[in-house]
UniProtKB/Swiss-Prot annotation:
Residues 320-464 form the PI-PLC X-box domain. The gene is PLCG1. Mediates the production of the second messenger molecules diacylglycerol (DAG) and inositol 1,4,5-trisphosphate (IP3). Plays an important role in the regulation of intracellular signaling cascades. Becomes activated in response to ligand-mediated activation of receptor-type tyrosine kinases, such as PDGFRA, PDGFRB, EGFR, FGFR1, FGFR2, FGFR3 and FGFR4. Plays a role in actin reorganization and cell migration. It comes from Bos taurus. Activated by phosphorylation on tyrosine residues. The keyword Acetylation applies. This is 1-phosphatidylinositol 4,5-bisphosphate phosphodiesterase gamma-1. Its EC number is 3.1.4.11. Residues 550-657, 668-756 form the SH2 domain. The lineage of its organism: Eukaryota, Metazoa, Chordata, Craniata, Vertebrata. One of its GO terms (biological process) is positive regulation of epithelial cell migration.
Length: 1291
């Protein structure tokens, strides 16, 4: 995600060491030193550990002793090394005299593959030791990233092997190998498959050495991918069945490949080709005049970064392109730069500023509020986000501003401070930033903004500016007051709502405005604490064993238990190839209170008694009298690390044998329940997360039936020998599977929460089943389609008595309140009354009223009407609310108050706080708002109009002077290049469209504009930046901490120039005739056509526990008329080396200067949902052609280790010699693509919401699903569904 910034904090770094010093440094780091580790967890005190560098794997490891590694980080993940105590890990111990290390003895390693980096905070024994580590690691970081791909593969292989071979015995078992391959996304169908491959490698023993493992890897990769459509190999007659190491690609053949297939002009020089091959291979035995590739090495080259699709020459900044005015550039810009997560409870962090600046961001935001001691603080105002000091932020900016780029940085000041604190801000700007702060114009006589070259290493202030001659005065603000901005809220924070099913209290985010209370869906109560989750202390240490997979309880009476144990161990070890030492523990059949250890050795099962005794009232456990343990768990853990010793053998306990039938005693398991019965049970629990597991009729088969998104769904679970399979995820047992999905989502965001059986139904079940939940229920093929139409739920009050005429109608009296009403066409509605659920009643017998159900409004209105945006669950009108404190509390919560509404009888919302003080503050403020709601709203609107500015701060504003946007000034003499305007995305959408896009582009040619996410994006999600970019907006500010598609597009835009943060807009955008939404206005720009074939992939990341089933989506994103998507088929169960059949995908691009080629790898899960795996996005103008590797990145745009696609790509002019469009252009292209590749999405639906893309194809697909679902529903449902139209019954 970050650009190529220097690893040292100040950007300079130590001078490069000599070759001799490198050897000395590497040897010293490999030996290691003892240093003190300062933890990020408050519960852990600093500890002394041995730190070493493992050169074979390029990792830093630490341990207490010599034989057990406690932790490791990959050097390739290190982003920065800072000298001194420059992390919060040191701050936690400032008051502890035992841990006050000398500043010069400390350093911090920042590493990770996400926006928020992790820290390794260390205290060495001397300053020389610190320098040794910093110099050595700085060299290793660069050397590791620049290493040739074969060397990177070698290091990766050793890392995988050593992760299993922890004792460094240079051998692992076949079972370990099978598990390892599963971890790297390769399915081994059975042990026989491995034994056959190992036989090919002349493997004769039960263990595998590293050399054999490496050879197996080469064999697996080549054998799977030699079938790819590579004409060069076919032409070279290298496709025969010989082993790849016996086939060679000579230097002349490789040179021919580079020239003819890759179009590499430099390859005409034979010496350059020779040098390239030698640097790639790094093999002393092939440092000869004519080096060569073995065939599998050549295929590895095709997938390598050395064969990238991106033209790396564009990574360099071209100074000649940096002489235009700032308004001609796209400038990398951050919104809410200080945040590390969401906008209501995450942490404000100095590290976020450092991270953004080192990623090349050139416009950052400072949200300033009055703080203590006369100095402002920075945070997201009136929220739970933490606060940081303004002065600390300035020091961080100074330190990191020009590490990644020397081009100017713009500080966008969101100022909420008093005049006094504004003056202090101005003073600190000058004091801290010094000469880098721009305080006067570059050229007074200029008629436009200065260029990036003119502003090198300068920091500009964006802030409102006073009129000439004012000491301070009020100026108009361009930001309208809005109740929906969380910064304008009266109070907000975490409160708790009771779950009506399990009566647990769950956190929700509440916002009190001048007229309403908004509350979110269930959220996390963690308020952005940087600390890692503290480990939970186990209660009852003597019972720790009960949840371990090796504990089987009582297996049988008498000798039955012994026989059952022997059978379990024998079946498990023979089937899985488990090693000696595999074991289980069971209750003793003959000695009450004792246990029996049964284990596998030399093909037989042996048994050992575990004795127990009481010692001072507490139990003790032992095998021999001289070594006693406090718990059975401690005893087993000990012998997993220390060998069992007796006269005949010495052996560690190795692999626990899982329980096979433990699920039968669980409350969620049903041995004899049909699908229909399961559905009927779940229909009575209208809560997502309700679930049960049932045995299916097919052998070794189960089903999880659950509720999600209001619907009942099912998924199959298959028992395959000793393994339980859910989709392609493997578990040791059904209990392990359920336990895993109680902690992780099973379907979208749904976790298994409420186990359902008859006892649970009696407590929480409704009287009437929810038949609506059976939409999709009868068709196992449709698991994921949501409700076909959103329904508006309300409450109604009866105007007359009504007596039901049929069984599916309600009976009610005048003034009855009918809840949860769904309005239907034809004069008949459905609702809940008198214990009856969703029965029919005539709509002309009732009048609508406010109801609790109506508090959850339709999604279309959420973004516009709520400060919580998509997180909104409910809203209450404060003047209509009545507040009552519950002194007695409720259900284990002491601090509870109730909110009721006079218009809704017998309804209240119980809300819990964490403390009495918090409860009283909420109650007080809600009551105050209820009395003064109208006055508060009027006051807020009055305050919006004027803002006081200190002269000292105003004088620091030179070029970026925010003013209200005035469309009438565009193109006139009144337009001033020093003025700029800011727009929330919703306002910007009014200008970046076909009607006004050309006019807005005219504005941006002279002046700057900044666009930022709307305030309702509390989850810090981002908007689509493409329409803003093509209309010339320079400062399109995004949440850098959010790993979504807009940020990935942003990273792609600034690829050119090596993430320097400035990209010159195409010259066509400075053509006054150019219209961003009209391709006929493209003058002097040649359209192009692209043809792509996806051939294969390597080292795709895993998503969860299963082996992925990947497919690739290829997208051209850019101008509205160019946008189009296509996708491959999916490959079953292979993420290590999948291959796709040759199929060309064609794209025609009218505006290649503003077009991106985007690859996204998804996996298709068991619900036919697509889950993100990896992506790569490039500007089209920087693509190379031929057989090219596409290096893949994660969602944070960080490079994934060795992950890549192999594609064949051709780019050619879209116009033929006679001037006509090529056969791959225009409508014919789209038609051909539809015929060739199945699902195709094209043309952005930019009318209305900018995020409502490609909706028509999805809508068509949804309708076809509904039709098919209705077919199954009508075929399988016993009772026909009836609707009413105009009073008539319809079947």
């Amino acid at each position: 995600m970050a650009g190529a910034a220097s690893p040292c904090a100040n950007g300079c770094g130590p001078s490069a060491p000599s070759d001799a010093e490198v050897v000395h440094l590497c040897r010293s780091l490999e030996v290691g030193t003892v240093m003190t580790l300062f933890y990020s967890k408050k519960s852990q005190r600093p500890e002394r550990k041995t730190f070493q560098v493992k050169l074979e794997t390029r990792q830093i490891t630490w341990s207490r002793g010599a034989d057990k590694i406690e932790g490791a980080i990959d050097i390739r993940e290190i982003k920065e090394i800072r000298p001194g105590k420059t992390s919060r890990d040191f701050d936690r111990y400032q008051e502890d005299p035992a841990f006050r290390p000398d500043q010069s003895h400390c350093f911090v390693i920042l590493y990770g593959m996400e926006f928020r980096l992790k820290t390794l905070s260390l205290q060495a024994t001397s300053e020389d030791e610190v320098n040794m580590w910093i110099r050595g690691l700085t060299w290793l970081m660069e050397d590791t990233l620049q290493a040739a791909t074969p060397l990177q593969i070698e290091r990766w292989l050793r890392k995988q092997f050593y992760s299993v071979d922890r004792n460094r015995e240079d051998r692992i078992s076949a079972k370990d190998l099978k598990n390892m391959l599963s971890q790297v996304n390769y399915r081994v169908p059975n042990m026989r498959f491995l034994r056959e491959r190992l036989t090919d490698l002349e493997q004769r023993t039960s263990d595998i050495t590293y050399g054999q493992f490496a050879q197996l890897y080469r064999s697996l990769m080549y054998s799977a991918q030699k079938t790819m459509d590579l004409p060069f190999l076919e032409a070279s007659a290298l496709r025969a069945g010989e082993r790849p190491e016996l086939c060679r690609v000579s230097l002349p053949e490789f040179q021919q490949f580079l020239l003819e297939y890759q179009g590499e002009l430099w390859a005409v020089d034979r010496l350059q080709v020779q040098e390239f091959m030698l640097s790639f291979l790094r093999d002393p035995l092939r440092e000869i005049e004519e080096p060569y590739f073995f065939l599998d090495e050549f295929v590895t080259f095709l997938f390598s970064k050395e064969n990238s699709i991106w033209n790396s020459q564009l990574d360099e900044v071209c100074p000649d392109t940096m002489n235009n005015p700032l308004s001609h550039y796209w400038i990398s810009s951050s919104h809410n730069t200080y945040l590390t997560g969401d906008q209501f409870s995450s942490e404000s962090s100095l590290e976020a500023y450092a991270r953004c600046l080192r990623m090349g961001c050139r416009c950052i935001e400072l949200d300033c509020w009055d703080g203590p001691d006369g100095m402002p603080v920075i945070y997201h105002g009136h929220t739970l986000t933490t606060k940081i000091k303004f002065s600390d932020v300035l020091h961080t900016i100074k330190e990191h501003a020009f590490v990644a780029s020397e081009y100017p940085v713009i500080l966008s000041i969101e100022d909420h401070c008093s005049i006094a604190q504004q003056r202090n801000m101005a003073q600190y700007f000058k004091k801290v930033l010094g000469d880098t702060l721009l305080t006067k114009p570059v050229d007074i006589a200029a008629d436009g903004l200065p260029s990036p070259n003119q502003l090198k290493r300068k920091i500009l202030i964006k802030h409102k500016k006073l009129a000439e001659g004012s000491a301070y005065e009020e100026v108009p603000t361009s930001v309208m007051y809005s109740e929906n901005d969380i910064s304008n809220s009266i109070k907000n924070g975490i409160l708790y709502l009771e779950d009506p099913v399990n009566h647990e209290w769950y956190p929700h985010y509440f916002v009190l405005t001048s007229s309403k209370i908004y509350y979110s869906e269930e959220t996390s109560s963690d308020q952005g604490n940087e600390d890692e989750e503290e480990p939970k202390e186990a209660s009852g240490s003597t019972e720790l064993h009960s949840n371990e997979k090796w504990f089987h309880g009582k297996l049988g009476a008498g000798r039955d238990g012994r026989h059952i144990a022997e059978r379990l161990l024998t079946e498990y070890c023979i089937e899985t190839g488990a090693p000696d030492g595999s074991f289980l523990v069971r209750e003793s059949e003959t000695f009450v209170g004792d246990y029996t250890l049964s284990f596998w050795r030399n093909g037989k099962v042996q048994h050992c008694r575990i004795h127990s005794r009481q010692d001072a009232g507490t139990p003790k456990f032992f095998l021999t009298d001289n070594l006693v343990f406090d718990s059975l768990y401690d005893l087993i853990t000990h012998y997993q690390q220390v060998p069992l010793r007796c006269n005949e053998f010495e052996m560690r306990l190795s692999e626990p044998v899982p329980q096979t039938n433990a699920h039968e005693s669980k409350e969620w398991y049903h041995a004899s329940l049909t699908r229909a019965q399961a559905e009927h049970m779940l229909m009575r629990v209208p809560r997502d997360g309700a679930f049960l597991v049932r045995k299916r009729n097919e052998p070794n088969s189960y089903a999880i039936s659950f509720r999600a998104e209001g619907k009942i769904k099912h998924c199959r679970v298959q028992q395959e020998g000793q393994t339980v399979m859910l989709g392609n995820s493997e578990f040791d047992s059904l209990v392990d599977l359920i336990s895993y999905y109680e902690k992780h989502p099973l379907y979208r965001k749904m976790k298994l929460r409420y186990p359902i059986n008859e006892e649970a139904l009696e407590k929480i079940g409704t009287a009437e089943p929810d038949y609506g939940a059976l939409y999709e229920g009868r068709n196992p093929g449709f698991y994921v389609e949501a409700n076909p139409m959103p329904t508006f739920k309300c409450a109604v009050k009866a105007l007359f008595d009504y007596k039901a005429q049929r069984e599916d109608e309600l009976t009610f009296t005048k003034s009855a309140i009918i809840q949860n009403v769904e309005k239907q066409e034809g004069g008949w509605w459905r609702g809940d009354y008198g214990g009856k659920k969703q029965l029919w009643f005539p709509s002309n017998y009732v009048e609508e009223m406010v109801s609790p159900a109506a508090l959850e409004p339709e999604r279309e209105h959420l973004d516009e009407n709520s400060p919580l945006g998509d997180l909104l669950r409910g809203v209450l009108d404060v003047p209509a609310c009545q507040i009552a404190v519950r002194p007695e509390g409720k259900n284990n919560r002491l601090f509870v108050f109730s909110i009721s509404m006079a218009s809704v009888a017998h309804w209240s919302l119980d809300v819990a706080a964490d403390s009495q003080e918090e409860l009283q503050d909420w109650v007080k403020k809600i009551r105050e708002v209820a009395q003064t709601a109208d006055a508060r709203l009027t006051e807020g609107k009055m305050m919006e109009r004027r803002k006081k500015i200190a002269l000292e701060l105003s004088e620091l504003v030179v070029y970026c002077r925010p003013v209200p946007f005035d469309e009438e000034k565009i193109g006139t003499e009144r337009a001033c290049y020093r003025d700029m305007s800011s727009f929330p995305e919703t306002k910007a959408e009014k200008y970046v469209n076909k009607a006004k896009g050309k006019k807005f582009l005219q504005y941006n040619r002279l002046q700057l504009s900044r666009i930022y996410p709307k305030g309702q994006r509390l989850d810090s999600s981002n908007y689509d930046p493409l329409p803003m970019w093509i209309c010339g907006s320079q400062l399109v500010a995004l949440n850098f901490q959010t790993p979504d598609k807009p940020m990935q597009m942003n990273q792609a835009l600034f690829l050119a120039g090596g993430h320097c943060g400035y990209v010159l807009q195409p010259s066509v955008m400075r053509d006054e005739a150019f219209d961003p939404f009209d391709k006929s206005s493209l003058r002097g720009l040649e359209p192009c056509a692209i043809c792509i074939e996806v051939l294969g992939a390597r080292h795709l990341p895993k998503n969860g526990r299963g082996i992925v089933c990947p497919f690739v989506e290829i997208e051209v994103a850019g101008a509205e008329y160019d946008s189009i998507k296509q996708k491959t088929e999916f490959v079953v169960d292979n993420g290590l080396n999948p291959v796709w059949p040759a199929k060309p995908f064609h794209f025609q691009i009218s505006n290649p200067e503003f077009a991106f080629l985007r690859f996204v790898v998804y996996e298709e899960d068991m619900f036919s949902d697509q889950n993100f795996l990896a992506q790569a996005t490039f500007p089209v103008k920087g693509l190379k052609t031929g057989y090219r590797a596409v290096p893949l990145k994660n969602n944070y745009s960080e490079g994934l280790e060795l992950a890549s696609l192999l594609v064949k790509i051709d780019v050619f002019p879209a116009k033929q010699e006679n001037g006509d469009l090529s056969p791959f252009g225009g409508a014919s292209l789209r038609e051909r693509s539809c015929d060739a590749s199945g699902p195709l999405f094209h043309g952005r639906a930019r009318e209305g919401s900018f995020e409502a893309r490609y909706q028509q194809p999805f809508e068509d697909f949804r309708i076809s699903q509904e039709h098919l679902a209705d077919h199954f529903d009508g075929r399988d449902r016993r009772t026909p569904r009836r609707t009413r139209v105009n009073g008539d019954n319809r079947l």
